[in-house]
Amino acid sequence: MTEESEETVLYIEHRYVCSECNQLYGSLEEVLVHQNSHVPQQHFELVGVADPGVTVATEATSGTGLYQTLIQESQYQCLECGQLLLSPSQLLEHQELHLKMMAPQEAVPAEPPPKVPPLSSSTIHYECVDCKALFASQEMWLSHRQTHLRATPNKAPAPVVLGSPVVLGPPVGQARVAVEHSYRKAEEGGEGAAVPSVAAATEMVTEVELLLYKCSECSQLFQMPADFLEHQATHFPAPVPEAEEPATQQETLVPSPTEAAVSQPDPLPASDHSYELRNELRNGEAMGRDRRGRKPRRSSSGESGATQELFCSACDQIFLSPHQLQQHLRSHREGVFKCPLCSRVFPSPSSLDQHLGDHSSESHFLCVDCGLAFGTEALLLAHRRAHTPNPLHSCPCGKTFVNLTKFLYHRRTHGAGGVPLPTTPVPPEEPAISFPEPAPAETGELEAPELPVSEESSAEPAAPGTYRCLLCSREFSKALQLTRHQRFVHRLERRHKCSICGKMFKKKSHVRNHLRTHTGERPFPCPDCSKPFNSPANLARHRLTHTGERPYRCGDCGKAFTQSSTLRQHRLVHAQHFPYRCQECGVRFHRPYRLLMHRYHHTGEYPYKCRECPRSFLLRRLLEVHQLVVHAGRQPHRCPSCGAAFPSSLRLREHRCAAAAAQAPRRFECGTCGKKVGSAARLQAHEAAHAAAGPGEVLAKEPPAPRAARATRTPVAPSPTALGGTTSAAPAAPARRRGLECSECKKLFSTETSLQVHRRIHTGERPYPCPDCGKAFRQSTHLKDHRRLHTGERPFACEVCGKAFAISMRLAEHRRIHTGERPYSCPDCGKSYRSFSNLWKHRKTHQQQHQAAVRQQLAEAEAAVGLAVMETAVEALPLVEAIEIYPLAEADGVQISG
């Protein structure tokens, strides 16, 4: 197979990865040759009973009864039957023969081998090959062997001696899990101490089994891929099958003699390790096992092709594989072992120790799709291919594989008696996502936001063979990946608990990153500013501040964000969705932490308290600045643009100053009124204001209207006839965004929060009292500025003259003294001012003059009206003499006729 590469020169895609060390290769031959380096040559020496520690070479003419057997291994070996092959092509052809064996062949009962005397009739002790220490159980021996593995990780493999467990260390430079060996005690076959023959020794050596499949979740080892796949299914939630007809009472309660023999627990513990030596004879009779050492499964219906089930004699629990039954029986005999960090349960202390090593290991490579962390980049690259819609090796059942060998072994599980292949991929059911119920508005508790389902994802069908998430429109190649994505991303399942503070998380990697907050460990420094972080994800988000990249952009206003979660929260503003309401003042927020920060202003007690004085602060930065200035007597680092103080230069470099952004040159110009703004988002918001005000109004160039006129002005949509066209010929006007209108003064606002703050002007509400003097304010920022009057803090200093101010706005007004800028001009007389407050005071003089002029005009008008009445009465006297006045008969009235 030739190496396939992309059209680009810089990137070459490797299609094959080694399952042991995760190295990437471009052809199958290279990875097969490389995998041969992971299989060490193993020497099995059969030692006599009298002196098990002595090794004697075999001689053809000797009659001592000691033998030495050497197992040779070829370059290419079938992992299923152990046959040796000479080339990769022969290995592939041989594996295809296994695929064609769809129907299981009936095993021909072999002749019973000659009786082999036991190796030892006494109790077996487990001996360590390094320090010669003896142990009474496998668990104690395994725990002891872990100390040697951690001390000497690159030790060369030692010879395996029958009768004593041996641990083979990994080769130098290979990051592999050590392959452990253990042996089961041989059964007593009869009396006598005859030395086994060469044929018997050879047959015993051929019974050594290699367990090549290791579970990544619990580190258990398996020989057959079917047992490995069945075990892996226990770690993932399987779909609930339809209700089947219950078995008859006879099948459930009356087991057959064969079933009773199978359901009994083994007298010896099952081996979990890579090699297992079994004596197949018991008192001259073969045990009920096949040629590979597997127990025969019990059929629930009596037919060979039916579903096979195994029952536990202690609790009547049903299992689908002998390995599951053996693990369950071990839990009855030895109990279970629980992890103190993640509450997972393991059947043996060795698997628990290996799992605890996963908690302490570092994972530097994070998958951006599912959040899983990996120790090497090769593992991450191999994992990333599972997220692609068209993986390298895809099975019709929905599973994908990167390694061709594992894919071929998986295909055999769909043979006769296995899992049938689906004719068409079954689309996943709509996930039942549960969110916490929102609290009533009057309780003041947090209300959970409802995530809107995208109309595009529901209307647009997914590609054939893929599964699409209905909430975020992402596509997956397997239903299992979609289920995992919905569980970790959209569902609020938090099953992993921190053992220190009790906080719950969705993934174990999140717990590991969270534990570093307790230990203070920050192993991921930024290469630009050297700031350390406790997780690679936080480091990746931080590096966006240096590059200036904002990959997540809002489609409504064009504003860009560094995180997708921030964009989702921002879109709630456009949707006018504010689910979090304050019980005290009724202000609503679209983020829960903003409501939490808002509540501190009502209580007056802030979360960050100083240990040396009774003061408290809303932000940790303010507390650090306070401790630096007041208690340490040092000057903080200040931003030259806005004057904000920071405890360190690193925090100052991270600061993104809004004042500096406002002083930057404005490059975006409005096509309607010519106004220039500093960003595309502000330009779109400004153009939206034009659309809300109507096409006939100009916002920026016309002088500001009087306050009464601005308060009563409302946008009026012009009719088609007023624009000079007919209703049929005029094009459809674009949908305009209407702002939020105040019911009292008809003033328009762009956000709900601005409207809520404005309404306090009409209601007179001031929900933010000062804890020092009791003065109340309408906004929390006004209270924060006011409290500096009590503390005497003036954090905003002028860089020209050194004068300090308590409010940043006062500093901005003061800078105009040095620059001579007067941006606020009066529309009536043209006089300009440095601050808006001075302009407002000046406008009051015009209003007073205008009111005085109006009063004078009214007085003059009243005087003119009175004079005109008097003059009219004098001139009418001659006319009154000619008027006849006579009484009415029906009513007391006067009728004048001339």
From Swiss-Prot:
Keywords: DNA-binding, Metal-binding, Methylation, Nucleus, Phosphoprotein, Repeat, Transcription, Transcription regulation, Zinc, Zinc-finger. The modification Phosphothreonine is found at residue 726. This is Zinc finger protein 574. May be involved in transcriptional regulation. Residues 707-734 have a biased composition (Low complexity). Belongs to the krueppel C2H2-type zinc-finger protein family. It is found in: Nucleus. The modification Asymmetric dimethylarginine is found at residue 834. Residues 243-305, 417-460, 691-735 are annotated as: Disordered. Residues 273-290 have a biased composition (Basic and acidic residues). PROSITE patterns: ZINC_FINGER_C2H2_1 (PS00028), ZINC_FINGER_C2H2_2 (PS50157). A zinc finger (C2H2-type) spans 16-38, 76-98, 126-148, 213-235, 310-332, 337-359, 365-387, 393-414, 467-490, 496-518, 524-546, 552-574, 580-602, 608-631, 637-660, 668-690, 740-762, 768-790, 796-818, 824-846. GO terms for cellular component: nucleus. The modification Phosphoserine is found at residues 164, 301, 719. GO terms for molecular function: DNA binding; zinc ion binding. It comes from the Eukaryota. GO terms for biological process: regulation of transcription by RNA polymerase II.
